[in-house]
Amino acid sequence: MQTEFIHLRTQSSYSFLASALTTEKIVELASSYKMAAICLTDKENLFGSLEFALYAIKKGLQPIHGVILNIQYETGVFAEILLIAKDETGYKNLLKLSSITFTTNDRKICNHITFEDLKEHQEGLITLCCYTEGVIGKCLLANKEEQAEMFARNLQEIFGDRFYFEIMRHDLPEEQLIEDNYIKIASKLNIPLVATNKVLFSKKSMHDAHDVLLCISAGVTKEYPDRKTVSENCYFKSAKEMIELFADLPSAIENTVNLTQRCYFAAHTNPPMLPNFATKDISETDLIRKEAKDGLLARLDTKFKSEHISIEHQESIKTEYFARLDYELNIICSMNFAGYFLIVSDFIKWSKKQGILVGPGRGSGAGSVVAWSLLITDLDPIKFGLLFERFLNPDRISMPDFDIDFCQERREEVINYVRSKYGNNRVGQIITFGKMQAKAVIKDVARVLSLPYKFADYLTELVPFSAINPVTLEQAIREVPELANAAKGNGLYNLEGELELIKLVLDTSLILEGLHRHSSTHAAGIVIAGTDLVDIVPVYKDANSDMLVVGYSMKYCELAGLIKFDFLGLQTLTVITDCKKLLKEQNIEIDFNDMTFDDEKTYQMLCKGKGVGVFQFESVGMKDALRRLKPDSIHDLIALGALYRPGPMENIPTYIACKHKLQQPDYLHELLKPILEETYGVVIYQEQVQRIAQVLAGYTLGAADLLRRAMGKKIKAEMEQQEEIFVKGAIANNISEAQAKSIFATVAKFAGYGFNKAHAAAYGVISYQTAYLKANYPAEFVVACLNLELNNHDKINLFLQEAKDNNIKIIAPNINISGGYFSVKSVIPRLDCGIHGDQLKDTAVKPQYDIDSSIIFALGAIKGVTPNFGKLVTDERNARGAFKSIVDFIERLPPKAINSKLLENLIKAGCFDELHDNRLQLFLSISKLLAYSVSYHEEQASNQFSLIKVSSLSKEILVSSDYADKNTLAFYEFEAMGLFISNHPLTEYKEIFNRLNILSSADLHNNLPDGTNRVMIAGVIQKKDSRMSARGRFVTLVLSDPENIFELSIFSEEVLKDYVHLLDVKSLVVVNCDIIKDEGGIKITAKSFSSIENATGNQQFDLQLYPKNDEELEQIITLLSARINNDEQSNTIATIYLSNKSVKNFVAKITFPEKFFLKGQDFEILSIYQNT
């Protein structure tokens, strides 16, 4: 195709919030205008270069790589320069220069390169001096023509005929002001002009939307004065438009083509590139064979001892395992992946030597005997029936991918080891790009266009939420009628007004949705290269880290030839580590390496559904599944972990029924019984699909993996081809065509959501480990869980409730006992006794584990108090003894460590109750206490420190005050800790709730039948969330009662409207609700609400009382007299039975004519007189 003009100045959304175009859109525009090439020139970065090149090549266009950088010519002189890669050397210099802007020079003013950087890396580059934003243009705008010419000569001296003057015509005054002098200098120095047009949006009509984008970037509204704007002409113009625009400078148009013809490099994909792990003495292949064989011998030695395998059976086991090892090694080495395995093995072995807990495996890698032998995984693949071909398929070459779980607290240590081993310039994180997704873009655009908040908030709530597959705004408008109505300009159903503005917000949001908003880093991905990263990919550094970050997203990172290693931080491993540390303080050593998975206590606990804190088994539905399943082996835990997902969940009842012999398993065919027996005929695992194809239809395991993939993808053509192969193979195995087709269809259905058994098994092991710790060492386990959730008061509530359910006492926060973190208080002396894992029960000599341990509440779990403050308090106590009073506390801690909110929450949480029994008085004295702190320490620091003066300062710090009642103190605690510790506000209502048949949260689980139940339940509202679903808005409430916390939903707008006054946090309510109880757990839907006062004050009771003497009679009459209230809501009737002291039978009965308004605590007091 003959091209007359090429765009050399296009920016994509990788120029964050500056361009409204994606790389793909830029290529599409160039293609639609019949251009032969297109140049991408993002600001400061090359993040989109490979993506852009691949799109362009796919469309038959020549990609040209450029970048716009800030350059410092001399002190204080900064300007823009446009650099274009002529060849591979030029592209590598582009990578280096763009990376320099992020990694080396002082970035306080702006990201930039220096003139010296440019000279050093000029080879292979074509340079355009930017027009008004370049150094020449800036000098001319400042009337410094001589200086402009000097800079032009300097650049020409470096680049020669690779230096151009960019010229633009966007109809801007500054462009017109300098054009004549600019052209004159170019002509004088014989520097060619090249015509460009800033391309920031596709067409002129997009200018308004782009203007909104600039406002989002600046954080201002459209009405903001003196904000940055761009010309409406910054759109993708056709060649015809550009030729007409520069009709008087035809050479400037021609030079766009001439310049392009000088460029002959495009970013491309590369084969995988890894560091060489070989040494001068041994190759990678020989090294992996040696280390794997030595490792397998060690693994088998441990296996033989822990499983008590007799010597006569050991040899046959060795033969089986080494045959599998050799098979795997041959495949690994033939694929040239030996180095990959050795690299992973090296950093995992280092981690374990440092005492850093590493997960037993994750993903399909746990199916490799080589990985097990090299200590990469800790799961015996043959014992668990795992397949190597699921991880590395000899019939389909692809990179292996080990995802490694580390203790979250120490993950950084492992990464730093890798950096030190391979070099900081060869190890990097992976960039991620945050996009303007539907909800976020509506909020951003609404803010810029000044749409009132209530409209913007309602619009965003209408967009359905999906974390896995985010719903686009276009989808939402199609699926949500109210959004569709608003997009047509008809406004919102529930809010009047702003019709046109709402439509404009949605129209603009549709244009901007999907653009990149910012960059971040991948949570786990690390790349390790065999050369400096900047030789292959763009790199940058986050301002908060000294570690390089690869500027390609994960997809393009791998296409560029970089190998990703996932260093994942798993909180559960931190829980296990911390729990083991706490036990070690009691001289109890736990070693899970030789665990036999048969601890009776563990399975007894799981059978009761006690899954809180147990990895994978924490949800309500999962706990219910545990109760029904009654697991008694590790295989049950593995299966349940794999089954409890959308789709496979429907097979849980079949699995349970067959396990308990209530139903006969269906093995599909007698040949399949050995494969499906473990899962009672249910096809759960992908590995089972592979085995079925192998046994029934003669597939190799590699070919069976291709079958599994085809079934998972459900691509019709592939499925038909595979069915033909399967049926043909089955017929050869004496199976009828009809049965073969039936089995294929059944297996295909299961395979669509089959789970990777290697991953399920590895995570099942972690589940067992956490369950074992919880069942055998509950206090230490709960403390380890709590210390990971110091800022999550919902989780703290949950774990403390779990502790109470296990009869573990909770010691309220106490300034003389508590530390920064939760801790265990044990009263049994600690003995020296080491023990291994779940063999503890079989050991004659056992350490004394304190079953009466208590948990001490953490200061760091109080709002506004950090663990560091807790450490300060602990250090002071250890150095100088316990605090004697609040004044002593104030005097011993530095004033800068204590602020008003911190002191308030310490008081409200009851931390000083041991020192002072009136919290309200301390609370009212906070300002005086803080003032005294400053005065005391100032006096102490002065040369005139006087005990007498200090004594006078400390007098009358505390103001006079009455004592707060129990409920006030309870809500103090809730405000400070998000929970009730010493007393729950509903405790006093227990008796009246029983009378009114108002259920407790415990009753919901224990005393309700399956199905739908209409009940009343009471609670204190602790949290309120408003959400949107496809059906509309709904509200979830988290409530608590003295037994537990629970959640309910409100779906009815009418209920929300009628009871809005009762739905504030801290409200005490009685809820009339529908409870659906089934195998998935309990779901509560509110139908109506009452305040506690109304719910308990309008019921009639016949209160029968039996005083034993005159004194008790007097007390009853005094209390009832104070509660006489004959209004309609006070219907409690009291009857007193008087007894003769010498006769057991009652001789008189008095019924009061009055009605009483009794409170919950009154029932509590009167209950002592209700026994005859």
UniProtKB/Swiss-Prot annotation:
One MF term in the entry's GO annotations: DNA-directed DNA polymerase activity
Top class in the EC scheme: transferase
Alphabetically sorted, this entry's keywords are: Cytoplasm, DNA replication, DNA-directed DNA polymerase, Nucleotidyltransferase, Transferase
- Pfam families recorded for this chain? DNA_pol3_alpha (PF07733), DNA_pol3_finger (PF17657), HHH_6 (PF14579), PHP (PF02811)
Q: Where in the cell is it found?
A: Cytoplasm
Q: Identify the CDD domains for this entry.
A: DnaE_OBF, PHP_PolIIIA_DnaE1
User: One GO biological process from the UniProt record?
Assistant: DNA replication
Q: Which SMART domains match?
A: POLIIIAc (SM00481)
EC number of this enzyme? 2.7.7.7
Q: Quote the Gene3D superfamilies the UniProt record gives.
A: 1.10.150.870, Bacterial DNA polymerase III alpha subunit, thumb domain, Metal-dependent hydrolases
Entry GO terms, CC: cytoplasm
The reaction(s) catalysed by this protein are: DNA(n) + a 2'-deoxyribonucleoside 5'-triphosphate = DNA(n+1) + diphosphate
What family name appears in the similarity comment? Belongs to the DNA polymerase type-C family. DnaE subfamily.
**Quaternary structure note:** DNA polymerase III contains a core (composed of alpha, epsilon and theta chains) that associates with a tau subunit. This core dimerizes to form the PolIII' complex. PolIII' associates with the gamma complex (composed of gamma, delta, delta', psi and chi chains) and with the beta chain to form the complete DNA polymerase III complex.
Function as written in the Swiss-Prot or TrEMBL entry:
DNA polymerase III is a complex, multichain enzyme responsible for most of the replicative synthesis in bacteria. This DNA polymerase also exhibits 3' to 5' exonuclease activity. The alpha chain is the DNA polymerase.
Name the chain's protein. DNA polymerase III subunit alpha
Organism of derivation: Rickettsia bellii (strain RML369-C)
